[in-house]
Amino acid sequence: MAAAAVARAVLFSAARRRLCGFTERLLIGGAAGRSLYFGGNRLRSTQAAAQVVLNVPETRVTCLENGLRVASEDSGLATCTVGLWIDAGSRYENEKNNGTAHFLEHMAFKGTKKRSQLDLELEIENMGAHLNAYTSREQTVYYAKAFSKDLPRAVEILADIIQNSTLGEAEIERERGVILREMQEVETNLQEVVFDYLHATAYQNTALGRTILGPTENIKSINRKDLVDYITTHYKGPRIVLAAAGGVSHDELLELAKFHFGESLSTHKGEIPALPPCKFTGSEIRVRDDKMPLAHLAVAVEAVGWAHPDTICLMVANTLIGNWDRSFGGGMNLSSKLAQLTCHGNLCHSFQSFNTSYTDTGLWGIYMVCEPATVADMLHVVQKEWMRLCTSVTESEVARAKNLLKTNMLLQLDGSTPICEDIGRQMLCYNRRIPIPELEARIDAVNAEIIREVCTKYIYDKSPAVAAVGPIEQLPDFNQICSNMRWLHD
């Protein structure tokens, strides 16, 4: 692919694209007014924050006759982001075709019936635009960033890509080699490896337990028919959202959608492909390698899907645990109690909590990198903090976590691309864009009592999934880890 021509980003895992958690990017909350204790500034700050929330542009949504949803937010910028969010990912695959969705994403920019690969790259470059794509376990996304005046061309290119890709045999063979090399690179990224293992043990023998890239033998055998069958089965109007943000007119976007997708994307004529259930299993995977300098460990319990009422509360609990790295500094002044204990005891190099949500299940847990001698101590402190969430978390801690969560969520909506991503994801997950004031109210409704109740429901005395790689001789056995999921009385 020509340099700076077509940017393609691969999301290896819904859980891993940003360890802050998939749901944290889905549920975009409002910002409470930051209290500035300088006389009248406190009131003005609160009023200003409220005014920002009220001034957020409306998200307009229209559904075409074929089921395709068109959603946009017009902020009047000179640039825009427009994309297709498709309810199709590796979870809809089986053992034989696992890896097809990701393979298809690789083929997206390799030429269509109207444009060769070179023509496509030159057109994008001449527009000053960028094309991007990624695959997760439940979604596939194609989007473009361009000048607002080029919105019609961007939509036409996206329509051409998903409806008219040539999927030539030569290009398939070339991308097969690219994906195999990509798999080798993933194997050197221990964070990626650990999260693949975590899904494999948590969702054994189910679609969520399989990797997005697929096994090597599948990559070597996937052919054009497999790719065409996947498109024919899953790329249907009711499962696609055309989302846009920036300087976009919803009426113009709607007309473009009708012209490019109104007749070509049909509804399901037969039975709609069902989302296979994925049962969580408390279990472990250990890959011991004493030659490695550091131990990499992930521990998680089963959480909930996107639309579950407890999602917000689990996100606040996730923020309470927080994240830490040796470069942070701060010492005992860190907001996270776990970060204070970790820093004071020099227990690990870094840790990061996560809350990964899917349609009907999720993983709530922590990923950490430790010295071999401190693995057991670090895990003990983590589990002790989890138990504290269930029994004795304070109102002041919860209030601080709520403010931090709302701030982080708002900060992520910086520019047309993250806003467009938020629109696309929320439309697939909730069939609407949840207003910021509503999310702000839902976060504010959480208190310490609710945190204790919900954490007891999902964490206390639950069997976790554990994935560990490296020098993990000191890691306690699984039965001991499970016993520490209960409060230990002295």
Curated annotation (Swiss-Prot):
It catalyses: Release of N-terminal transit peptides from precursor proteins imported into the mitochondrion, typically with Arg in position P2. Its main location: mitochondrion. The keyword Ligase does not apply. One of its GO terms (cellular component) is mitochondrial matrix. Binds 1 zinc ion per subunit. Signal peptide: none annotated. Its cofactor is Zn(2+). It is found in: Mitochondrion matrix. Keywords: Hydrolase, Metal-binding, Metalloprotease, Mitochondrion, Protease, Transit peptide, Zinc. Belongs to the peptidase M16 family. This is Mitochondrial-processing peptidase subunit beta. It comes from Bos taurus.
